[in-house]
Every structure is written in C-alpha cells, then in structure tokens.
Regions:
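Membrane-helix boundary elements
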Residues: 54-55, 59, 64-79, 83, ...
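Residue-level recognition of pore/gate-forming positions within transmembrane alpha-helices
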Residues: 30-31, 73, 121
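Hydrophobic transmembrane alpha-helices
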Residues: 1-59, 155-156
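Short, surface-exposed helix-loop/turn micro-motifs enriched in polar/charged residues
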Residues: 20, 43-44, 67, 85, ...
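Mid-membrane cores of alpha-helical transmembrane segments in multi-pass membrane proteins
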Residues: 26, 46-51, 65-72, 91-96
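Membrane-embedded alpha-helical hairpins and interfacial helices in multi-pass inner-membrane proteins
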Residues: 1-5, 23, 81-164
C-alpha cells in the first residue's frame, strides 16, 4: 500500500500544479536545447524559443512570458560560454513579436502564431545581416526555424494546450 502512495501523490501534484510544471519543463527544454547547440558548436542554430514563447504568451500571459523569454534566451548563452551576437540579440525580436501579438495570441493562437513567426524570421534575417553572420546562417537557419516553428504550432502546441 505504501508503494502506491508516492505515485498517487505525484499524479495529484501534477494535476494540481500542471501549469507550473509545464512552464518549468518548457524552460528546461529550451535551455537544454540551446545549451546543447552551443556546446556542440553547431553551425546552424535551430532556436525553439520563438514558438515556445508564443505558446507561453498565449497560455500564461505576457507577464509570465517576458521573464520566460529573458531567462531561457540569455542564460544558456552565458552558461555555454560560446555565443554569437545574433543569437544574443535574437531575444529582442522575440520580445517584440510577443508584445505586439499578445492580445491576438490569447484569442486565436494558430493563425496569429504563424504570422508572428514569419514576422520574427523577417527581423531575424535583418539581424543576421546587421551582425554580419555567415552565409549559411543567413539563408538556412531562418528557413529551418520557420519549418520547425510551423510543425510546432501545427502539431505540438495543441497537445501542450491540452495539458494546460
């Protein structure tokens, strides 16, 4: 009987605090993903923060999303000790897009998130040209981030919103 107590308690705790647990899991996912890409010195940096932050803004609101973006966008850059200027500055367009589309994200997530992701990629390409990044980073990375974001918005975001 005592072996059933811990799993039941964990399930009840998850059901009571699932919004908090999901937020912490998303922060951990974004930070570990970013840290891994920096420590492996990958040439193409597929950032999942733009569309995860759009989901957090739609589900938790802008007051939770702003610290989420700042923590999960900047901390892995310093933790890895290897950061590029464009990756460091990409937090600014992410914040701008989330602030600009915060009201619409809460009412209609999917169409607004698709458009907001395209706006973010446009400003990220401008940022890549301003910071004089490599050619493959200017061309391949925005396309890959857009496709990955569309897949996230289309398939994974509905599953996550079911948990919240």
């Amino acid at each position: 009987m005592k072996f059933l107590l811990l799993p039941v308690a964990l399930i009840l705790a998850f059901l009571l605090y699932r919004k908090f647990v999901l937020l912490i899991a998303l922060i951990a996912l974004v930070m570990v993903w970013d840290y891994f890409q920096h420590t492996m010195h990958l040439m193409i940096h597929l950032d999942i923060l733009p569309f995860v932050s759009l989901f957090v803004t739609s589900e938790y609101g802008l007051l939770i999303a702003i610290p989420f973006i700042l923590i999960s966008g900047i901390v892995p850059e310093f933790a890895a000790g290897h950061f590029e200027m464009s990756d460091m500055l990409s937090v600014i367009p992410i914040l701008g897009v989330n602030i600009a589309f915060a009201g619409a994200l809460e009412s209609q997530f999917s169409p607004t998130a698709y458009f907001a992701l395209l706006v973010f990629v446009f400003f990220q390409v401008i940022l890549f040209f301003v910071t004089a990044e490599r050619t493959e980073k200017k061309i391949v990375e925005p396309i890959a981030v857009t496709l990955l974001g569309f897949i996230f918005i289309w398939r994974i975001a509905p599953l996550l919103s079911f948990l919240v």
